UniProtKB/Swiss-Prot annotation:
Protein name, entry field: Rho family-interacting cell polarization regulator 2
PANTHER family referenced in this protein's UniProt entry, alphabetically: PROTEIN KINASE PKN/PRK1, EFFECTOR (PTHR15829), RHO FAMILY-INTERACTING CELL POLARIZATION REGULATOR 2 (PTHR15829:SF2)
GO (cellular component) term, any one: cytoskeleton
Reported function: Acts as an inhibitor of the small GTPase RHOA and plays several roles in the regulation of myoblast and hair cell differentiation, lymphocyte T proliferation and neutrophil polarization. Plays a role in fetal mononuclear myoblast differentiation by promoting filopodia and myotube formation. Maintains naive T lymphocytes in a quiescent state and prevents chemokine-induced T lymphocyte responses, such as cell adhesion, polarization and migration. Involved also in the regulation of neutrophil polarization, chemotaxis and adhesion.
Post-translational modification: Phosphorylated. Chemokine-induced phosphorylation in neutrophils occurs in a PKC- and AKT-dependent manner, resulting in RIPOR2 interaction with YWHAB and stabilization. Phosphorylated by PKCA, AKT1 and MAPKAPK1A; in vitro.
Annotated region (Disordered), positions in chain: 488-534
Originating organism: Mus musculus (Mouse)
Induction: Up-regulated during regenerating muscle tissue.
Coiled coil region boundaries: 108-137
Protein's UniProt keywords contain Membrane: yes
Bias-annotated ranges (Basic and acidic residues): 509-525
Length: 1078
């Protein structure tokens, strides 16, 4: 350890006893190194860099420009570290998209931590039971103490998760208020100018500014709960790049945090560095920038490379070993071991002052006083006392009181909260937040009546459409490998938590009151089972789709019975909708299938819903963005998918809501605040006399008197549908609109499923094309498939835009289908009238059996089912026939069906089935024969007569994987002889190279052996990529195949062998694009 290095005490959980080097944090303004800006970054799986050499140079220059700042004296490093640690600087502009991404990643990491410790706790508890009979008292005491330590740490993790959820819920509320204020600004800007309008606009501008400040303050508070990253230097790796005596300097920048270290390559191949590890504090808006420079002399420095890396994937419970491509060619890689701790050093270190020690002791006693193994965790009951100060109640009551009394929007700023007061609300909470026994006693059912509902109209809240960003940022790919976790490190982590201090927050999961129920309605029987709901703020906006008819009120609404809810089961509005949708209700005809349809079809369809449209779009953009400039087909696909995304976000009034057809007026802009009406039910005052029944308040929505209802509707003329609108906004039940967290939908379930399937297939094709980009003939074949998908996306966008998905004829979706009447007639039998766009694989095979099984079994007994499964796998572009058990979950779209037969020139299904039957018969023969008969059969079959069909090629390749050397040699000689036919060799080479891009490991291994038999030197580049697989068996087979391909293969293998193999799946780069993942 060089001089000047400082030590920290053990870092939280897993690093007890490990010295940690302080980060060299300079108070220099952070550079804006994201070319697309934080808002231009979609959710990514990669620790990545931004492509483009010019952007790289600009980032490198920004480091060089700060060279003078780097030479500042470092006498106050610890103080600077503490300043950065607390991060008191609030951002100037909120970044809601980035906050959502970081929140999801943080929540997953915390859940992973909790799951890991729960597993360890179960293991120790079982061990304790086994040891009680024959162990000494001292051993039992130590084990019991260890169990209690883990329990305390788990409670702290659960409390930390609740604080994060609280902040995120408050952030979402402020974001929606900001959106509402923005719409109000637009409404007043387009309305006739007057003095009152100008005054109201001024007030709204102030409100908008305060909402923005609130969001920024919450972002800063959330950032302080992200924990810390411990980064350990593992060294540089590179082929023909690292020579003895070379000196390198690595400079890492993360916001205001800096780390610079120098290293030298020794003669024996080892590396010496002046810094071993450092600590970086996670940021919400910020990426790690890494610059590597080679030091040649006093004034000669050569820039090796500079990358900017994503950090979301670093929120994991286990240490991760990552390999970062530094230069464009990927010949220099930086190996780091990164460990994330959910609690930072200062949180786990007792304060030095006597007063602080006392406060810390009190908080510790408050947090851990119930420390027996039998104390329930948050999974069993809530440990929070409901705090009566609620951000939501303050905003809601103020807003509706203003509307009710003043009938003016000029007082909207009264909705805002002071940013400092908001922070104090979350930071200065009482210490004694945990209760041991009151939670279970306070749990009481809540009964609500829906007699307020009279009108049958169901209005869903609308929102202005926003187009997705046309350009997305690309990140360098980085490989992640979990490091080993020792038992001693776990113990040290848990023991380190005993000195931790606790904070507290209000509980969003329960209330200890019982609002008044409808006096005239009957209560639900207490014996009936409750509704299973998802608790916690993680599901603040549920992504579920429900028919509008389930939310419409009937004429006999007054006869509806009250709904019994549980105040400890999370958001009450969500429970209401869950209960409504789970009860018997009217079912629309477009949701039903005709009699005789496959029962699992609807289940298979539902598996693609629940927000999967957004997931499919995000997954496609994630795979496409780093490479969209590489091929013209990628650019065309990006254009069509973006257009389709815009169409779904800009649905006309008929498929969205009644209010979306209104012009943007002040009245319609006020609908943005409807979520304040029913999004939560805050506690009434204890005496029950101070309840404010303001028009538009939560109580008035479910009130029993016509006076209150008419009073509220007189304030807002559009109030008839506000209940259903508010339910849609707060629960995610209903149709998504742009700018809202509700799920996308076309309004037709079958069309939604079809879009998801094709988006997923395009994502798969993109990954295969990128993998085979260095082998042109393979990439060209895959690009042809992608071009057909681009045309499908055009048709899907047209159908979604013009007809709103309400098509009852396949010809309307594919006009060319009328030219293939036999195929059209068969598809009509397979799909239901309510789902013309898709059919389940089981239903398709059932119809094939009814139509063609007899003729096939007549010539080839028992072969009908394998033939049909093979056909389905070909339509779906699968590597091998589907298993019978997976048929019910597979979905075939009408575009897949039509595209397959069109691309293969098939106009008559029966003729094609006859050809396919002969192929399957040959495959069955080869697979069923024993080794001696197999050799005889292959000797009788002339290689020149061998059909170059994928089923035959796949079977021959799989025969090469048999343990029998004689069979393998015979198949090898057979393929070598058959490859003399140029047509056969071309088809076989294309199939086997495409098989290398599939996810089937057995098929990849077989394809490598087949390419070895064909002596396919054209596949060298793909085999080089496959040699970096994370599966040892695949790497071995690919390496052997490389070495068998002559001098070119041997040279490629020697170059590959220079790279270290301790890091899994090290990615490469394509052109100027970075392709490495964190």
């Amino acid at each position: 350890m060089p001089p000047g290095t400082k030590r920290l005490r053990a870092l939280g959980a897993f690093s007890a006893g490990l010295p940690t080097r302080l980060p060299e944090i300079m108070l220099v303004g952070s550079q804006s190194f994201s070319p697309g800006g934080p808002n231009g970054i979609i959710r990514s799986q990669s620790f990545a860099g931004f492509s483009g050499l010019q952007e790289r140079r600009s980032r490198c220059n920004s480091f060089i420009e700060n060279a003078s700042a780097l030479k500042k004296p470092q006498a106050k490093l610890k103080k600077m570290h503490n300043l950065g640690h607390k991060n008191n600087n609030t951002p100037k502009e909120p970044q809601p998209k980035r906050v959502e991404e970081v929140y999801r990643a943080l929540k997953n990491g915390l859940d992973e931590y909790l799951e890991f410790h729960q597993t360890e706790l179960d293991k120790l508890t079982a061990q304790l039971k086994d040891m009680k009979r024959n162990s000494r008292l001292g051993v039992l005491y130590d084990l019991d103490k260890q169990i209690k330590t883990i329990e305390r740490y788990m409670r702290r993790l659960e409390f930390h998760i609740s604080k994060v959820d609280e902040l995120y819920e408050a952030y979402c509320i402020q974001r929606r208020l900001q959106d509402g204020a923005s719409k109000m600004k637009q409404a007043f800007a387009t309305s006739p100018a007057s003095k009152a309008a100008r005054e109201s606009l001024s007030e709204i501008n102030r409100s908008y500014k305060e909402y923005t400040e609130n969001m920024c303050a919450i972002e800063a508070e959330l950032e302080s709960l992200l924990g810390e990253f411990s980064i350990k230097m593992k060294g540089l790796a590179g082929f023909a790049r690292l020579c003895p005596g070379d000196q390198y300097e690595i400079f890492m920048k993360y916001g205001r945090q800096r780390w610079k270290l120098k290293g030298k390559i020794e003669v024996n191949g080892k590396q010496s560095w002046d810094g071993a590890e450092t600590v970086f504090l996670p940021l919400i808006v910020g990426f790690i920038s890494i610059k590597v420079t080679e030091l040649k002399g006093l004034a000669t420095h050569i820039l090796v490379g500079s990358v900017t890396c994503e950090t979301k994937e670093l929120f994991a419970a286990r240490p991760q070993v990552v390999a970062v491509d530094i230069n464009d060619l990927g010949t220099i890689k930086l190996n780091l071991e990164i460990t994330w701790y959910p609690f930072d050093v200062e949180d786990t270190t007792p304060s030095s002052g006597p007063g602080n020690k006392t406060a810390a002791l009190q908080r510790r006693m408050s947090m851990y006083s119930q420390g027996t193994p039998e104390t329930p965790t948050f999974k069993d009951q809530s440990f929070f006392r409901w705090l009566r100060l609620s951000v939501l109640s303050a905003l809601r009551d103020t807003f509706f009181a203003t509307l009710h009394h003043n009938h003016s929007v000029g007082d909207l700023p009264s909705l805002s909260l002071n940013p400092k007061a908001l922070l104090e609300f979350y930071s200065n909470l009482p210490d004694d937040i945990f209760e041991s026994g009151k939670a279970a006693e306070e749990k009481r059912p809540l009964s609500l009546s829906f007699s307020d509902l009279q009108d049958g109209d169901c209005v869903f809240t609308s929102s202005s459409a926003t187009s997705p960003s046309s350009s997305h940022s690309a990140h360098p790919e980085i490989t992640i490998t979990p490091a080993e976790l020792t038992h001693s490190s776990l113990s040290s982590q848990n023991e380190g938590t005993e000195d931790s201090s606790s904070a507290s927050s209000r509980n969003s999961l329960g209330e200890d009151h019982e609002p008044k129920s409808h006096p005239k309605s009957d209560t639900v029987e207490p014996g009936k089972p409750g509704v299973a709901t998802r608790s916690g703020t993680e599901s603040l906006f549920l992504e579920s789709s429900v028919a509008e008819a389930l939310l419409q009120e009937s004429d006999e609404a007054s006869e509806l019975k009250p709904v019994e809810l549980d105040t400890f089961e999370g958001n009450i509005t969500k429970q209401l909708v869950k209960r409504l949708t789970s009860a018997e209700g009217p079912v629309t005809t477009d949701k039903l299938f005709f009699e005789g349809s496959v029962g699992s079809e609807s289940e298979a369809g539902r598996s693609f819903l629940d927000g999967s449209l957004e997931d499919a779009f995000n997954g496609l953009f994630l795979a496409l963005d780093p490479h969209k400039k590489q091929y013209k087909e990628f650019q065309d696909l990006n254009q069509e998918v973006t257009h389709l995304d815009d169409v779904l976000k800009c649905k006309p009034a008929g498929s969205r809501s009644r209010s979306s057809s209104l012009s943007l007026t002040v009245e319609s802009a006020l609908e943005s605040f409807d979520f304040l009406n029913t999004s939560d039910f805050d506690e009434e005052e204890e005496d029950g006399d101070d309840v404010c029944h303001v028009g538009g308040g939560a109580d008035s929505v479910f009130s029993d008197t016509e006076t209150e209802k008419s009073g509220y509707r007189s304030v807002h003329p559009e109030a008839r549908g506000h209940l259903s609108e508010a339910l849609t906004e707060d629960t995610g039940v209903g149709t998504s609109v742009a700018g809202s967290p509700l799920p996308l939908t076309t309004g037709n379930e079958s069309l939604d499923i079809t879009i998801v399937k094709h988006l997923q297939y395009c994502t798969q094709l993109i990954q295969q094309i990128v993998f085979s980009s260095k082998t042109p003939f393979v990439a060209r074949s895959l690009l042809e498939k992608l071009s057909r998908q681009v045309l499908v996306m055009q048709k899907l966008a047209a159908v979604s835009d013009e007809n709103l998905g309400n098509i009852t004829s396949v010809v309307e979706a594919i006009p060319e289908f009328h030219k293939k009447l036999s195929l059209l007639a068969f598809w009509t039998k397979c799909c239901s009238p309510s789902g013309v766009y898709h059919s389940s694989a089981a239903r398709l095979i059932k119809q094939l059996e009814a139509s063609f099984a007899r003729s096939i079994n007549k010539d080839y007994p028992g072969l009908a089912e394998p033939v049909f499964r093979t056909l389905v796998s070909q339509i779906l572009d699968r590597a091998e026939p589907l298993l019978s058990s997976s048929l019910s979950s597979e979905v075939i779209t009408v575009f897949q069906y039509y595209s397959f037969f069109t691309s293969h020139g098939v106009s008559d299904l029966e003729t094609y089935l006859g050809q396919l039957t002969r192929q399957v018969a040959m495959v069955q023969t080869l697979q069923s024969l024993r080794d001696e008969k197999l050799l005889q059969t292959m000797s009788d079959l002339a290689p020149s007569n061998l059909p170059a069909q994928q089923e035959v090629l796949r079977t021959l390749a799989l025969l090469l994987t048999r343990d029998d050397n004689e069979v393998s040699e015979a198949v090898t000689l057979y393929l070598a002889a058959a490859s003399k036919n140029e047509h056969f060799r071309e088809k076989a080479l294309l199939y086997y190279c495409e098989a290398l891009t599939k996810a089937n490991l057995q098929l990849q291994k077989a394809a490598c052996l087949a390419l070895k038999s064909l002596e396919a030197t054209e596949s060298i580049k793909m085999l080089v990529t496959l040699c970096q697989s994370d599966t040892e068996e695949i790497r071995t087979v690919a390496s052997e195949t490389l070495l068998s391909l002559g001098e070119d293969g041997r040279l490629a293998y020697e170059q590959l062998d220079k790279f270290p193999r301790d890091c899994v799946k090290v990615g490469g780069r394509h052109g100027t694009e970075v392709a490495t993942a964190f």
